[in-house]
Amino acid sequence: MSRIVVLGSGAWGTAIALSLHRRGGHQITLLAHSPEAALEIAEPRENILFLPGFHLPPEIAITASESAVGDAEIVVSVVPSEFLRPTLARIRPYLRPGQIIVSAT
């Protein structure tokens, strides 16, 4: 089972997390930019702001803790280009050699 962190919890990040979950065989974590953003998605299990109408199953973890990146085998970056540099700076301490980084920005 692959451990995948989707970096960015907007419409695109949420859609990718759902798609990877539906394919099966992956442990998915959706990494939001703030605890408030994570809570807004985690409590209703839906990204009401950016992707309403799509239920997030309980198997998809939702967090704002950058340390989740350290446990991932694959990190999928879907943050808007204007926020990419500061976001990567925040997760850099948690990146490990051998991790696969995918840019879907």
Describe the role of every protein-language-model region:
Residues 56, 62, 67-70, 74-105:
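Rossmann-like NAD(P)(H) cofactor-binding subdomain of soluble oxidoreductases
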Residues 1-51, 61-64, 90:
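NAD(P)+-binding Rossmann beta1-loop-alpha1 motif at the extreme N-terminus of oxidoreductases
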